[in-house]
Amino acid sequence: MTDTTGKLRAVLLTALMVGSVIGAGVAFTGGAAAANASDLNDYQRFNENTNYTYSTASEDGKTEGSVASGATIFQGEEDVTFRKLDNEKEVSPATLSRTGGSDEGVPLQMPIPEDQSTGSYDSNGPDNDEADFGVTVQSPSVTMLEVRNNADNDVTGGVLNTQQDESSIAVDYNYYAAEDLELTVEDEDGLDVTDEILAADQSGGAYEDGTGNNGPNTLRFDIDPNNVDAGDYTVSVEGVEDLDFGDATESASVTISSSNKASLNLAEDEVVQGANLKYTIENSPEGNYHAVTIDSSDFRDSSSGADAAKVMRSVGDTVDTGLVVDNDSTTEIVDDYENTSISDVDYAYAIVEIDDGNGVGSIETQYLDDSSADIDLYPASDTEDAPDYVNSNEELTNGSALDGVSTDDDTDFDVTQGDITLDNPTGAYVVGSEVDINGTANEGTDDVVLYARDNNDFELVTVDGEKSIEVDSDDTFEEEDITLSDGDKGGDDILGLPGTYRLGIIAKSDAVNSSGGVKDNIDTSDFNQGVSSTSSIRVTDTELTASFETYNGQVADDDNQIDVEGTAPGKDNVAAIIIGSRGKVKFQSISVDSDDTFDEEDIDISELRQGSASAHILSSGRDGKFGEDTANSISDLEDEVGNYTSGSPTGDQIRDRILSNTVDDTASDDLIVTQQFRLVDGLTTIEATEGGEAGGSLTVMGTTNRKADDNTITVELLQGDASIEINSTDEWNSDGQWSVDVPLSNVEPGNYTVEADDGDNTDRQNVEIVEELEEPDQTTVDQPENNQTMTTTMTETTTETTTEMTTTQENTTENGSEGTSDGESGGSIPGFGVGVALVAVLGAALLALRQN
């Protein structure tokens, strides 16, 4: 190492040391100075990448000064300078750009706009290389603003008593490194009372002038509510300079009261019976317990002990509910609600705790009378105005605990009747049919009951064996596929007979007796006084339609099956009975679908002999039984009909016995549909053909008595034993007429045979396929002189030639000129027209033939 090199290194080392000392002590414009992180004051920002920072706020709390790389800045800030720590060089905000996101590459602006995109910005922007300077932009926000009483409980939105002289306003916000926070308190007239309500001495980062900064810790402004008048106040906070917009500000309200008594506030003055009524206890210190009661005189007459126990709901801040009885001999808290007589109940109570500034509870009005009801609020337990009536389990101590205690507040509210509607069934109802029952009820109605009325009282209608229908949480009710006449109650019987009646729906709470059971009947006056509605319903008798599928009145014994379809509203099933001429019987039960239709395919009739037969559909009618007392069900009827076949009776005898014991029986309302048919051999025939031109098609038509869909008729074009073309069909109507088109695109002219085959039966017919079908050739000849047209039709056969001539009189034109044929001149040879010449030629040809 040379002396020169050593000297240079020494000089360089000395320069670096001096520069470090200078860099550690330099003060920048605006009061910014480098310091160790542990010595920073509340106004300084931390540089997360180093132990150094630059102050960004002067002593008056305003944003001025410089920040170094890694600092966090906020939307809306002004007067912020970026400087490098190592050389004090100022960095232009425009050189920093967004490093990622949908706005990647967008430059940073100064002043920072209120809508500047949040996130990181650096000198490299979206590039991955390490940047020499970068900052992070955040949205300024107040994250918490609460008014707290002496016990440090949140009473925001509630009541702060003037005696709470150690109350405070607590704030959390994220821009403490950029700006101080400013507090403003206004009364209900908008007058600023901040200086008046602030306590003389402040701590927790607050200053006497209503500003403050406690860094990352909660900022507290100490207040004395006794310094201001009672009333409603609004508390607001925001940044002292730039950050006074959007989420950087927050407001809250509080009611300052000089009263020592708690107050009761109802959510509504009028409520529909069955709805829940919210109440709020205000103006009471945090943690107090208050008793709220409703006297039994406001209960519904039909309420039971269990119902009364539900009046005060165990929700919100309610910690205990119950009933107190006073039966002259004792006053006590009820343990057994089910066995408690409503006449012994004195009142229902709730114990409510004051939490977050107030106490919230709720009343179930379903069990209150539809009139005006009173609610009482008692002083807090264990205070100068009331004894300690709440035990350590947060329960009322005993039934006499509130005796002799004056209330802090009382108020009343009106309970009105609600609405209930029955949307279905309405209009017409077929006896025995299934319907959907649905409708709507007002809030708080848990169950509804269906009734029917003829002339007197409303009679109970059971719903699938139940006496009531549950109301869903959306205040609707529905039961599907219900037979209204199925039960054994009076209303079921009413709806089992044709006529016009009143159908009613009523809240279950209005339809129960003193023991809580649903009443079997309710007189019209009581029904109308309850939460109910009625509509008219017309009950009609059952009906029956049916059609058996035959083909031209026949059923082929090759099939030995028959189909039937029809309608039977109000029935679950019907009986199909097919009777042969020799006394054979086929009996089958057929189910009726929910849409009142039935459809049964492939009923086996193989036991029947050929000949005439009858098919019947038999329904039991609205009474559900066959005949007067022949059979009570389809299965019973099947056994009965089986008895009719003993002794080798004829088909007519069996039919007579069935009719006499069902539809023709005394007082019977049975219904029957009868259809005659013949059971015969299967037969498929060819009746006619059309077409037959080579290259075209041949249509083959015929009749059959075979069952469509289950059978296929195949038509084959044969030449000798060779099959030329084939086609088929499995569709034809009840007249048995079928049709098949056989393609002739590859068939040469000649004589052929067509064969129709249904699988069991065949039929044949000879046909001729020609090269071209003959069509009449018409020539029109004009006769211009007499305005006539002659049409000659020639048909040539092997034996003779026939010439027909017809003339038609043409209409003359409007100007009287003679008609002419299209495209021809109106002139002709006088006396010797083309028509005359044609006749002459034909005559000569005929003469030549006769000579030959």
Swiss-Prot record:
Residue stretches spanning the membrane: 829-849
UniProt PTM: N-linked glycan at Asn-36 consists of a glycosaminoglycan chain, constructed by a repeating sulfated pentasaccharide block composed of GlcNAc, GalNAc, Gal, GalA, 3-O-methyl-GalA, and sulfate in the molar ratio of 1:1:1:1:1:2; the other N-linked glycans contain Glc, GlcA and IdoA.
Pfam families xref list: PGF-CTERM
Low complexity bias spans: 785-823
Signal peptide: 1-34
Motif stretch (PGF sorting signal): 830-832
Region Disordered: start-end pairs: 84-131, 772-828
Bias (Polar residues): 115-126
Primary localization: secreted
Keyword terms of this UniProt record: Cell membrane, Cell wall, Cell wall biogenesis/degradation, Glycoprotein, Lipoprotein, Membrane, Proteoglycan, S-layer, Secreted, Signal, Transmembrane, Transmembrane helix
Gene Ontology CC entries for this record: extracellular region; plasma membrane; S-layer
Record site feature (Not glycosylated), residues: 51
Residues carrying a glycan: 36, 339, 398, 438, 513, 643, 727, 751, 787, 789, 791-793, 795, 797-799, 801-803, 806-808, 811-813, 815
Any single biological process term in GO: cell wall organization
Cellular compartments annotated: Secreted, Cell wall, S-layer; Cell membrane
Family: Belongs to the halobacterial S-layer protein family.
Reported function: S-layer protein. The S-layer is a paracrystalline mono-layered assembly of proteins which coat the surface of the cell.
Stated name of the protein: Cell surface glycoprotein
Organism: Halobacterium salinarum (strain ATCC 29341 / DSM 671 / R1)
